[in-house]
């Protein structure tokens, strides 16, 4: 609220549910965007006719993606043959996966986070379910929570593609800067892009010769970001819609042989 009152530009790197105001932007996708894209992918790329859904109750992220997927599925003629849910803290998904296996869907959309996704996929394979598992960007790092065999063919929507040259360079620079061996998850490049977008806005205001801190300067920063047309970041190119949500490519990551491609 204070940022809105003062006109300071804010870019939220990773909250798809934050309230958007005239001077507040997102660097990440909103939940409906991901759910719709995955329904499209199921039908257009996987030729799926039936789907099951597995989501977390009481979780805005999970329910948001689930609702968007189901709505788009209805529009596309993708039949939802089973819907299963779990509560925060649950770890045993045998019952839900047994039900899903019995429904025999072509795909299972599981808009949940990687740890629970790994448990669910492992339980599904044990129950005899061979459907393709699909997730949102919360699936990132799922390969650390289930076997390569169980994950084979699973796909998820991501804000960036790990294999691109720009991402590879970012990962190497990140590991060197913080003296770590682990590859950063999606939140690091999103935070980097958020800072980059702010810098581009500031640069535009400076080039106009405006005085920092004035209302004209603040508005120039906002206008520069709002009017971006394909500005390149680590996670993709940025333009913004009327609600200050990013219009950027969606990367579909597939788990193959234990690797993300």
Describe each PLM feature range.
Residues 1-82, 130-159:
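Extracytoplasmic ligand/sensor domains, especially the bilobed periplasmic-binding protein
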Residues 1-2, 50-56, 104-114, 120, ...:
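Periplasmic-binding protein-like
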Residues 34-37, 84-100, 165-169:
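Structural motif
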Residues 40-47, 70-78, 98-105, 122-129, ...:
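Sec-exported extracytoplasmic/periplasmic mature domains
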Residues 80, 260-261:
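Residue-level detector of beta-propeller blades
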Residues 91-95, 101-127, 197, 253:
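Hydrophobic alpha-helical
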Residues 121-192, 205:
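Extracellular/periplasmic periplasmic-binding protein-like sensory domains
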Residues 174, 178-188, 199-260:
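Segments of small-molecule ligand-sensing domains
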